[in-house]
Structures are given as C-alpha cells and as structure tokens.
C-alpha cells in the first residue's frame, strides 16, 4: 500500500531524525486511575489526572519524538508538549466491557478522525483486543470496525496506528506460562491479518511475541521458550508484516523492556521504534500523590529522564528506520 505525501509527512513528524519512532505513551485512563488509587483513599480527580499528564509532557517530551495522549484527559498535556514533539491521539474508549464476551471495540463517541486531526494530532491511534482463535462472529465485527477507522483515516489523510493486544478468554491470566505458550501465534497471526491493505493501517503498535519472563536466561523460574525458540518467534513476527511496526512496553520494567529490544534486534526483528509508557513514567505516580507536584517533577527530571535516555540509547543501536519498509 502506497502512503500519501501527507501521511508520510505526518509520520515524519512522529519520528526522530533517524526515522525511528521513539514515542512516549500516556493515553492511559482506566489503568492510570487504578495506579493512582493505590496511593490514595479517594478516587483520583480529573484535575489530578490532567496535571500528572501535563507534568510528564512538560518534563519528558523534549526527549521523545512524539507523545501518545487521550483526548479525555490529555489535551492540556498536548498543549504543554515540546514544540518539536509529534502528537498521536487515542480514538478508543478505555478498557472493555468485562460482562460481555469478545472485548468488542468502541470509539470515543464525541470524537472522529476529523476532530482528532483538528485537535492537532499527527496520527490516530486505536487499540483493539484481538484473539485469532475467537469465533468468527466476534472477529468479523472487529475486522469491520477496523475497516471503518482505516477508511476514516484515509478520508482525512491522517496516519492510522493500530495497537493490537492479544488475549484468550480461556486463559484469564495473560502473564501466565499457559498464555506464554500461545502468545507467539496469537501476536504474529493478528499482525499478519491487520497488515492486509483493506484495513488501511499505516503503523502497527504491537506486543513482543513472547513473554520474556519465560525465556531461558531471563528467568529463574519456569522456562517456556529456549533462547533460540524465542528468537524464531521474533523472526516470524518480522515476516508477518510489510508495515512499519513499533513495540509497546506492556507495563514491564524499564530494564526488561530495554533488554527485550536488544534481544529482538539480535534475533533479526526490524522494528521501527517504541511507544513506551509505564516503563518510563510509572514511578512518578506514587511520588506525585504522596509528595506533590515539585517532587514528581524532580523524579521525572532524574529517574524519568534516565529511563527515557537509556531507552533512546538502546533504540539507536536496535531499531530500524520505517523508511526502509
């Protein structure tokens, strides 16, 4: 699929000078509220959530090629970002209906690709929960939904970043060894599917195809994959798509995420950057609530900066320019 000049220019605005997308993810809403609630008795206020996003944006966007925010709580943070930093805006409602089967997707009802673009977004990002082994009755709805968003983004000439999170309703714990065994196929088959031209996806935001906590040499406990098996899953991921793809950090520690990127590169994965969220900023949440804004700023300027700087150094030696795709 050939991209328009406008889409290419927009992806340029989200990348660094090497054609790598080193993006900061802070579109968390439900997950962020839960993190904040661990450190205070009353529910987090809108003002608290917005201010924390502003702090992270003010302190860290000078080190990121772009930032992913949500239009519900993230617009003040968008205004506060470094002027060289590109903007992705999330289009999906946070979370999913736990009482309904299928984790069906849902857009923010007050927003459209046109409105996100008018808000200054260089790209639209949408998160989809997808299980290639789910019933076709469920999956056909998801495919049609993504086709709609893809067509909307073509109409507005704005890049479409699709984030795919895999799951299995029969394995409730996606951090378990049981899920680790099925994860590679689920991740790579979903990537292959949504790389089809009919979806008009420009960049895939994906999980790494293995749970690194079960890779030989990365764990003291149970081993699900040898190093060579894990490396093969990364090679299969590379073969699954012709599109640029970037990795999400999935809430793992900064250190493990950086080690994972090195492993992916050494295995032969030509990934094109990251959208890294909690691995960079999560430690600021507790500090912000317990010690206030100034202490949180100090954390972001020291530990937060170190996390993002270390990540950028790793990306320089591991990621590949999306322009090579």
From Swiss-Prot:
User: Which Gene Ontology molecular function entries are recorded, alphabetically?
Assistant: 6-deoxy-6-sulfofructose-1-phosphate aldolase activity; tagatose-6-phosphate kinase activity; tagatose-bisphosphate aldolase activity
Pathway involvement of the protein, from the record: Carbohydrate metabolism; D-tagatose 6-phosphate degradation; D-glyceraldehyde 3-phosphate and glycerone phosphate from D-tagatose 6-phosphate: step 2/2
- Would the keyword Hydrolase turn up in this protein's UniProt record? no
Classify the source by domain of life.
Bacteria
Q: Which Pfam families match?
A: DeoC
What reaction does this catalyse?
A: D-tagatofuranose 1,6-bisphosphate = D-glyceraldehyde 3-phosphate + dihydroxyacetone phosphate
Note whether Membrane occurs among the keywords: no
Q: Which SUPFAM superfamilies match?
A: Aldolase
- The main enzyme category here is lyase
- Entry EC no(s): 4.1.2.40
What keywords would UniProt list here? Lactose metabolism, Lyase
Protein's GO biological process: 6-sulfoquinovose(1-) catabolic process; D-tagatose 6-phosphate catabolic process; lactose catabolic process via tagatose-6-phosphate
- Family named by the database record: Belongs to the aldolase LacD family.
Query: Which PANTHER family would you find in this protein's record?
Result: SULFOFRUCTOSEPHOSPHATE ALDOLASE (PTHR39340:SF1)
The protein, known as: Tagatose 1,6-diphosphate aldolase
The protein's organism comes out as: Staphylococcus haemolyticus (strain JCSC1435)
The opening ranks of the lineage are: Bacteria, Bacillati, Bacillota, Bacilli, Bacillales
């Amino acid at each position: 699929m050939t991209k328009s000049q406008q889409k290419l220019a927009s992806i340029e605005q989200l990348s660094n000078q090497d054609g790598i997308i080193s993006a900061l993810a802070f579109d968390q809403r439900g997950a962020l509220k839960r993190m904040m609630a661990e450190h205070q008795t009353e529910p987090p206020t809108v003002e608290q959530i917005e201010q924390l996003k502003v702090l992270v944006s003010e302190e860290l966007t000078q080190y990121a090629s772009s930032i992913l925010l949500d239009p519900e709580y993230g617009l003040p943070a968008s205004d506060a970002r470094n002027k060289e930093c590109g903007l992705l805006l999330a289009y999906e409602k946070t979370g999913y209906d736990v009482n309904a089967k299928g984790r069906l997707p849902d857009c923010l009802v007050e927003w459209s690709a046109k409105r996100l673009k008018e808000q200054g977004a260089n790209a639209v990002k949408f998160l989809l929960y997808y299980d290639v082994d789910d019933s076709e009755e469920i999956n056909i709805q998801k495919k049609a939904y993504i086709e709609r968003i893809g067509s909307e983004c073509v109409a507005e000439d704005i890049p479409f970043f699709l984030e795919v999170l895999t799951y299995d309703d029969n394995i409730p714990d996606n951090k378990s060894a049981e899920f680790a065994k099925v994860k590679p196929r689920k991740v790579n088959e979903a990537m292959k599917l949504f790389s089809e031209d009919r979806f008009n996806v420009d960049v895939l935001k994906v999980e790494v195809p293995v749970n690194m906590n079960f890779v030989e040499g990365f764990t003291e406990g149970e081993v699900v994959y040898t190093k060579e098996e894990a490396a093969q899953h990364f090679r299969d991921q590379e073969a699954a798509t012709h599109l640029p793809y970037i990795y999400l950090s999935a809430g793992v520690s900064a250190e493990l995420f950086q080690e994972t990127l090195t492993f992916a590169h050494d295995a032969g994965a030509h990934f094109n950057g990251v959208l890294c969220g909690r691995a960079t900023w999560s430690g600021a949440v507790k500090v912000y609530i317990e010690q206030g804004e100034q202490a949180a700023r100090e954390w972001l300027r020291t530990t937060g900066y170190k996390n993002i700087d270390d990540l950028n150094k790793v990306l320089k030696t591991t990621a590949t320019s999306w322009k090579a795709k």
